[in-house]
Amino acid sequence: MDSMPEPASRCLLLLPLLLLLLLLLPAPELGPSQAGAEENDWVRLPSKCEVCKYVAVELKSAFEETGKTKEVIGTGYGILDQKASGVKYTKSDLRLIEVTETICKRLLDYSLHKERTGSNRFAKGMSETFETLHNLVHKGVKVVMDIPYELWNETSAEVADLKKQCDVLVEEFEEVIEDWYRNHQEEDLTEFLCANHVLKGKDTSCLAEQWSGKKGDTAALGGKKSKKKSSRAKAAGGRSSSSKQRKELGGLEGDPSPEEDEGIQKASPLTHSPPDEL
């Protein structure tokens, strides 16, 4: 037999050494983009569109809550001890300052609803996932998760970042919010602040996203439950007022008075005498 060519024999001898070197080499580290992609699979921080959307939502709510008062703020003393004209609180600088200083703290009342898509993942109330897990724990089921039970109700990283970005946004666009408050309240705040200024020339698709709600969703049905309670209270109040009117008109209509009712109730029943003996 012919012997194996010299170059081929050398390759066979070097092959085990190459395999050994490959095994000893350290694993390649993930680049920033790859690491960020893996992190985003679990934590997806809010976009600027989502931040502005919920800042506008809470600003609307806060201005609506503070706009129901008729309080007048005094501006000081007038000339020659005359009473100075006051300013309505609803048009005052004080109202604007109080709302903008506390607006970002309101975002900490939100929770992350991972079962929802888009910007609807941010909403008040407990998410369906954690509500189900809490119900299982209360029923005695042992639930094993990477997050300890004590931290289930803690603020998520996404909501904390939502509040952080809110602080920056309100400070950066303070003059825009003030301009809307003084001159453009007839315009929609979301359109004025977000579409026309904060997100001008950028993606505004999240502003049109609305959550329709699902059956049994406590976060979506909170308002409906309160309406039902209020209607029941009104009905109960109507019944009590009508019964009160009937009592007041009882004497005119010839209804028995309470004393007469008491006498009728306390009247002893007729007794039967034993039969006569023959």
From Swiss-Prot:
Record's family? Belongs to the canopy family.
Q: What is its main location?
A: endoplasmic reticulum
Q: How does it assemble?
A: Interacts with HSP90B1; this interaction is disrupted in the presence of ATP. Interacts with TLR1, TLR2, TLR4 and TLR9. Strongest interaction with TLR4.
Residues annotated as region Disordered? Answer: 215-278
Residues of the signal peptide: 1-30
Q: What is this protein called?
A: Protein canopy homolog 3
Q: Which domain of life is it from?
A: Eukaryota
Q: Which residues are glycosylated?
A: N153
Q: List the GO cellular component terms.
A: endoplasmic reticulum lumen
MF terms per GO, please?
A: signaling receptor binding
